[in-house]
Amino acid sequence: MRVQSKGSMMNNTFPVGIRRLCVGSALLLCMLLGGCKAPPLHRGLTQTQVTALKSAGFQETQQGFEFGSTGPILFDFDRYNLKPDVRRIVERIGRTLRSAGINGVRVYGYSDQEGVDEYDLELSRRRAEVVAIELVDVGLDTKRIAIVGKGKSDPVGDNKTPVGRAQNRRAAIVVSPR
């Protein structure tokens, strides 16, 4: 009985091009199937974190997951203090973020188009700051919270109407772990 070496057997059975094609296809298939085993991370978040954010009222946006883009973190005209009901909402959001293991957020403050630009920028920064303080009070790390005053930019309501201006006096909490 004559024994052939493994290499000579392969060379006699398949042409080199077909063998490479088969090996390459098998590797590609393994990579594709390997990606299906674990659920993909969504913008760096686990599926559990995404579920927690969505159930808390966060919406997916270009920025990440955002809470408060059209309310309910609203402010009275020329004010930056949180009303008691809004404070409870922010505390609930903070507890949700903490329990989901999300510690880093950005808080944006906004104003309507009444007033001087510089004043509105400072007012919007203070609005973001009071929201951030509430988040820290429920356990988020102050070093992982960015505060951004946006002033009159990015209105969500029509500044020609009282209702629209009220919608623009807001704060938003954004989670994007990138």
Ranges and model annotations:
Residues 65-73:
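Short, basic/glycine-rich phosphate-binding loops at helix/coil junctions
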